[in-house]
Amino acid sequence: MVTVEEVRRAQRAKGPATIMAIGTATPSNCVDQSTYPDYYFRITNSEHMTELKEKFKRMCDKSMINKRYMHLTEEILKENPNICEYMAPSLDARQDIVVVEVPKLGKEAAQKAIKEWGQPKSKITHVVFCTTSGVDMPGADYQLTKLLGLRPSVKRLMMYQQGCFAGGTVIRLAKDLAENNKGARVLVVCSEITAVTFRGPSDTHLDSMVGQALFGDRAAAMIIGSDPLPEVERPLFELVSAAQTLLPDSEGAIDGHLREVGLTFHLLKDVPGLISKNIEKSLIEAFQPLGISDWNSIFWIAHPGGPAILDQVELKLSLKPEKLRATRQVLSDYGNMSSACVLFILDEMRKASSKEGLSTTGEGLDWGVLFGFGPGLTVETVVLHSVST
């Protein structure tokens, strides 16, 4: 008779989890950041708030964002005027949009990831779906399973209302699933639509306007699994370790509350300062076992919560400007996409590395770090190992 230990050994994968494919998707509606303040104040019937509009213009100018993509068009907003007010009851209208559109956008990204992976979708064993855009039962994970035609026995995990750190969370969870279930192939999807957070301006709550200047809509998907099949599956990055921590003295720094008026965000403390002050501790804990202490010797994927966070992290750690190049590029091209951001940066980095003829998917370097930052303040730290291009 076999022992429990023998059963456990047979259930576990031999090698580390790897990212095998990445896919992304975007709504068709593209918004130019330079003209967005005029549009935003017009569509929310707030053009009389001239001083506030000038403040918002300065926010957009300093955002380092060139363009964003949004599901909410002028037509949709005119049909739902309560969404355009600052604090009008509007949750039903918002839910009607995101419950349908979040899984649909996720499906687009997932199909691209599955195509790159090259295996039949019947080989997907697990689905991890993450969104901060709305809540429903059965969830977006169920809707995605139906939209893709996955097996009814696929094991699903739905993560709602996590916020901007959750791109790191889904990678950490998928790593554990892949390494502890031999042959597992985990479809990870992050899909975010700002229909839950869009609202008109308020001169008493400027932190709400920060979000209006930064957030954009997109979805990203990955296939994660261990022990890739030779000649069939090609890993892009290996997942070496993953950790989560709460930063000291940061309670209330970022809050989000789902109310009748939608999802409201509040920035209550110096978020860039809190992150930059504490980030090196997470780096030391993650890289000391590898004998790495030079933060310029690794590649970087950091959630671009905003330019101030990136600037202060860069300054605190004396990072060379090119270290956050991929992160800044994604911020410029898409804005802050909450949980989907770090997946987009991974995609940007591996594509740029190949295009530039660099030796690895990590800008020619072997080791790298992925950071997710969000409400809590919560920090996700993932150590990555690149592969040859």
UniProtKB/Swiss-Prot annotation:
Keywords: Acyltransferase, Flavonoid biosynthesis, Transferase. Gene3D superfamilies: 3.40.47.10. InterPro entries: Chalcone/stilbene_synt_C (IPR012328), Chalcone/stilbene_synt_N (IPR001099), Chalcone/stilbene_synthase_AS (IPR018088), Polyketide_synthase_type-III (IPR011141), Thiolase-like (IPR016039). The active site is at residue 164. Pathway: Secondary metabolite biosynthesis; flavonoid biosynthesis. Its EC number is 2.3.1.74. Pfam families: Chal_sti_synt_C, Chal_sti_synt_N. The keyword Cell inner membrane does not apply. It is an enzyme of class 2 (transferase). It catalyses: (E)-4-coumaroyl-CoA + 3 malonyl-CoA + 3 H(+) = 2',4,4',6'-tetrahydroxychalcone + 3 CO2 + 4 CoA. One of its GO terms (molecular function) is acyltransferase activity, transferring groups other than amino-acyl groups. It comes from the Eukaryota. CDD domains: CHS_like (cd00831). One of its GO terms (biological process) is flavonoid biosynthetic process. The keyword Transferase applies. Belongs to the thiolase-like superfamily. Chalcone/stilbene synthases family. The primary product of this enzyme is 4,2',4',6'-tetrahydroxychalcone (also termed naringenin-chalcone or chalcone) which can under specific conditions spontaneously isomerize into naringenin. This is Chalcone synthase 2. It comes from Solanum lycopersicum.
